[in-house]
């Protein structure tokens, strides 16, 4: 099951949703009457329309953290070495990976960096700087960009800077190769919309000595994210990571405030004290998607366990 908190499925008035997919209540939303498609949206996106109306929980969390700590989120230096260290170890948090289910990174609770797929990207790409994180954000949001494409190229020895991650990468690369700007833009538009390459575009690429592997990579892409969008996601997530390192008490308080239903938080906190489940990634061979801690309740227990490992407690009544 896949639940998108801002994805609205649109169907005609005279149609029953059950004709296409079963529906169910989403997690703990029974009392609110909010239903979700039972199937992952990728199983139905060929015959259903979805409109993304995204919330801004992360921004709200940053505002609240700024109020509680007195540290303005906009004045945080996101190039702090301790923040980048979260993508290679838990040392900056003062705990070992064994204390949090053999999870090697300090990204628990940082939503942009803690999805199963992004964790797989960290393991595969070993990011060294913010630019790498922006590229990885694009890979995690694109379609046909990583599995069977960029992942194979990375395994062959290429780096994140070499492969296609964002739509901007294509236009800039083609211009550097000497292609006319208009042609470069048109090819970028074809590829980022999943339209592949027509014979004319392929010839234009050969004319400026674009290697065959690059052309083949373009043909596999279904959708490409814009770099600026990914830079925004990454920027906010890094600011949240700052609070996790330097203001842990406030971080966990705000995290549970925005990510846990008050009706269940007592049970989650109690469970976490005796929680020994390892953080493991499972790959669905049919789709290439990674899962395990995508389950919201499991994620809450992971975060609570990490909080206790750092010697921090949280009183839900506050």
Predicted features and spans:
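Noncatalytic, beta-rich nucleic-acid-contacting surfaces in large DNA/RNA-processing enzymes
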Residues: 1-318
